[in-house]
Design a protein with these regions (language model features):
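Long, low-complexity intrinsically disordered regions
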Residues: 1-257
């Protein structure tokens, strides 16, 4: 998005443009081809869902044509995850490419080790403790029977905020802390759902449902690039991005991540 005369203006292409993405299925194909894709325009021209879609359909509420609604459609496939992965901005990463981001963003650390070494904040730990068992290592979990090991493998955003003690009279900077955990690839969005009232009726805006990437795809898959240095993973991500945006400046490519 760009600002013109104090107003945010969506970028994009006309519906009839041959490069325009028209459906969640088409977007899923593009994400799997690229490996990863931010939602909104960034330092690299053309590298976003925004710039590949018709701006007039955003926030229309029509799942068939609204890219905002496609977030839920795509994450529910279990093949692609969503979160604030790109310079604190939201976007998608495919199952194939997530291990590269995990190794690069985590700098080779599982969360517990990161926290023990003083590289993660107290507030981050409050949130992660909701998802991590205190006596079972992630590598030892049978992910086909996840609920036998973990009480809450997934939680709504509002549940995370409440259970971790954020909000009025409690811990501050919930949004910033959750964004940091996503940027470090420890926390991801697996779906968006509305709240349900006592009658079982959905209401309000759709809420993000958070989980650990290990709970989506297993510890072995998420950490499979730990065998290489974070710098190697970073370089492979840049090489992949450069393949589709060969004219972009290297520094812009780095900033977009």
């Amino acid at each position: 998005m760009i600002v013109e005369n104090g107003e945010w203006i969506m970028q994009g292409v006309d519906w009839n443009d041959p490069t325009c993405i028209h459906s969640a299925d088409e977007l899923e194909d593009i994400i799997n081809e690229y490996g990863f894709l931010p939602l909104f325009a960034n330092e690299v021209e053309g590298f976003s869902v925004e710039e590949m879609t018709d701006p007039s359909y955003w926030w229309s509420g029509d799942t068939d044509v609204d890219p905002w609604e496609w977030r839920a459609v795509i994450t529910r496939t279990g093949k692609i995850t969503y979160g604030k992965f790109f310079n604190k901005k939201a976007g998608f990463i495919s199952k194939k490419w997530f291990p590269y981001f995990a190794n690069y963003k985590r700098d080779g650390y599982d969360f517990d080790s990161r926290y023990e070494d003083g590289k993660a904040e107290y507030r981050e730990n409050l949130i992660m403790r909701l998802f991590l068992s205190s006596d079972i290592e992630l590598m030892d979990i049978d992910y086909k029977h996840l609920k036998d090991y973990v009480e809450s493998p997934e939680l709504y955003s509002f549940e995370v905020k409440k259970l971790a003690g954020f909000g009025k009279g409690g811990e501050k900077n919930f949004d910033g802390t959750v964004a940091k955990l996503q940027m470090e690839s420890y926390l991801v969005v697996k779906d968006f759902q509305q709240k349900v009232n006592k009658k079982g009726e959905p209401y309000g805006w759709a809420n993000a449902i958070y989980t650990l990437p290990e709970y989506l795809w297993g510890y072995d898959h998420v950490t499979k690039r730990y065998k290489e240095s974070p710098e190697e993973s970073h370089n492979k991500i840049l090489k992949q991005l450069k393949k589709y945006f060969p004219n972009a400046e290297t520094e812009d490519l780095k900033r977009s991540l």
